[in-house]
Amino acid sequence: MWWFSRNILYSVSLLIGLALAGCTLEPLYKSGSETADFLQNIKLDAPKDRDSYVLYNRLAERLDGGHGTRYLLSITPRKSEARAGIAADGRAQRKIVTGFADYSIVQIADGKEVQSGSVKAFTGYAQSASNVAILAASNDAYDRLMIQLADKILDALILIQAQP
């Protein structure tokens, strides 16, 4: 009897797989798509500090900004740190880092703002006894935070393009 129900499960799985294979899904960043063309026409404002540089590099991987740029993307990252996991002696054993990025995309030709907004992300890192380990963990946490913010900005840009 178990053999029969197992065959039904396999059959249903096969039918679902065939149905999905027949649909017309296409990659979002496919060369020549509207989204890819839009993203290739965005130039990034120059980074001003270490955090902006990490954010800039992550976005530069996705945005071409080479030929015929029509838009300028300006980003202002902000961050704050809070203690979490307080030890009995009052030392923080963990820090939570919250980041915000205000972004604005304008048309280069006329300076008209196309869209602006803000994104938020957070991450954390452990405090240890070693100052070197704390510095390394802190830098890694800030890098992860900027990458999260860049990914959220990219998502927002794709949604801008998708709107009629």
Where are the model-predicted features located?
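Bacterial N-terminal signal peptides that target proteins for export
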Residues: M1-V12
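Sec-exported extracytoplasmic/periplasmic mature domains
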Residues: A60, D64, A150, L154-A162
